[in-house]
Amino acid sequence: MTYWICITNRENWEVIKRHNVWGVPKKHKNTLSRVKPGDKLVIYVRQEKDKEGNLLEPKIVGIYEVTSEPYVDFSRIFKPHRGGKETYPYRVKIKPIKIGEINFKPLINDLKFIKNKKRWSMHFFGKAMRELPEEDYKLIEKLLL
């Protein structure tokens, strides 16, 4: 079993919950091809601003288990990044294990996969998902309310 942290925005987090599916754009299909049924996905909602310009802090919002092999589906359920046309067609079906919220920034010092604690956001830059050490997964699973 492999543990993954999956990077999304708040709007697509709602899609994930509603459809029980994780999707990535074409440029990340090779990463998704390594995902197998039984793997665990930790959903990370990135820092962003709301419509009023208020800063919304990054959070861990749930843990899911993968229930399918990767597949392709071009139906438009996800909102494209920055107004693009990408449909996040490379997908896996998932089921919820634990849903809740953890503020991410207080975890940074305890997460092993984040080597540069000052520039922690660079560990997510340009990625849709990345492997997560089991130790980090267990910490998140324990703290998720």
UniProtKB/Swiss-Prot annotation:
NCBIfam families: PRK00809.1 (NF002008). It comes from Pyrococcus horikoshii (strain ATCC 700860 / DSM 12428 / JCM 9974 / NBRC 100139 / OT-3). Belongs to the UPF0310 family. It comes from the Archaea. InterPro entries: EVE_domain, PUA-like_sf, UPF0310. This is UPF0310 protein PH1033. It holds the Pfam family EVE.
